[in-house]
Amino acid sequence: MNLNEKLAVTGLVPVVKLKSADSAVALAEALGKGGLKAAEITFRTDAAEESIRRIAKEFPDFLLAAGTVLNCENADRAMDAGAGLIVSPGLNPKVVEHCIKKGYPVMPGITSPSEIELAMSFGLDTVKFFPAEAMGGVKMLKALSAPYGNLKFMPTGGIDSGNLQSYLELPCVLCCGGSWMVKGDLIDSGNFDAITELTRQAVDSMLGLKLERATLNSNCGAELKEHCGKLGMEFSDKECGACFSCNDVQRAVWYMEQRGFEIDPTRLEYDSKHRLTKAAFKAGNAVIRLEKK
């Protein structure tokens, strides 16, 4: 899985400002418990480099981006510390050229067609749309992306649980950046349980899992059948199971695999654009199905 594929299945990258590197590992652990093994650590404080280094050492599989990288020196420091991606609020040609020369994955910020075309002239296929809401939000991004069908965006700025899905539904959006689950006061007070819970809520909202129907086979007790039948549950002589609808099947599959579910490769279905639309997981003698809403 390449970097863009990892970003796509992750869907949401927490944007973090850490005042002290001593909070870095606990924060990453809290995010992971909530379902997100990713973070953009911003170079808005002197703790960024060491924070990246500590997280990379403790959690090697964490998707780590360095944010607010404004110069070549910070790009080098971030990558040496263990970052896997350089992100900046704007497009500084000198920084982009330096990153490309060094082989660093880089995602500069853009707000106009001119900046998009400059990014494309460097051979980039993914950019950051920042500040997303202040620049017109979903409506602006739809218009901005229209002429550039192969370009992907990571909108960041003003995104929260209320508008996240409206961005992720856009075909041009690879993933989103957000900070509402990693608020500064929660980090400063060490309230990592709250960060875990907010992260879990964000992931649940992003996946949008909803039980659509369930099936019980003939081995289930008659009384259980009777009561479950009143709830609209179906019955089958072959298997027990449940079917959930979700916002994005590929993303939901990835998250379920992270939680230990075993996918059934014989039950994958794709649409004409090769996007996963249906999947199934083994759950003992039962089957859990996923389908796109």
Regions found by a protein language model. Give the residues of each.
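Catalytic cores of alpha/beta
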Residues: 27, 71-81, 114-122, 159-174
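Vicinal oxygen chelate
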Residues: 204, 213, 253-293
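Conserved N-terminal beta1-alpha1 strand-loop-helix module at the mouth
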Residues: 1-82, 101, 161, 189-204
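Glycine-rich beta-to-alpha transition loops that act as phosphate-gripper elements at the mouths
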Residues: 17-19, 66-72, 88-92, 108-113, ...
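Glycine-rich phosphate-binding active-site loops on the catalytic face of alpha/beta enzymes
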Residues: 89-95, 128-138, 172-194
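Core segments of cupin and vicinal oxygen chelate
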Residues: 27, 44, 209-237, 249-252, ...
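Structural preference for beta-strand elements that scaffold enzyme active sites
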Residues: 11-15, 38-40, 61-65, 84-85, ...
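N-terminal beta-strand motif that seeds the catalytic metal site of vicinal oxygen chelate
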Residues: 3-17, 203-224, 231-244, 293
